[in-house]
């Protein structure tokens, strides 16, 4: 559970960021947003809209945790936190005035590794010779 003072501080910071950078995009990373994206059935490479995420939140909130486990093949440690996670993502998007959340299908560590490999190959075109 997140302290309300910390949430308010974060929301204030997000508001300030959105004033400096008016066209911010939200990028979600981690198990909860990945599962929410899969449940949404949005095509890969497309952002999850906040409208769709709100629909998912409403649907998941109406379902008991035990049914979420079965219906969406959620792990026990995910089934009870996915609703608050969706709420948090929606709040973040709201405070930066974003209508979409980009959900990469590659993890952060994998993405960094991929980026480093691309950079190395660009700098060393004959590495395999």
Where would I find each of the regions flagged by the language model?
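Helical "lid/coupling" subdomains associated with nucleotide-phosphate turnover
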Residues: 1-129
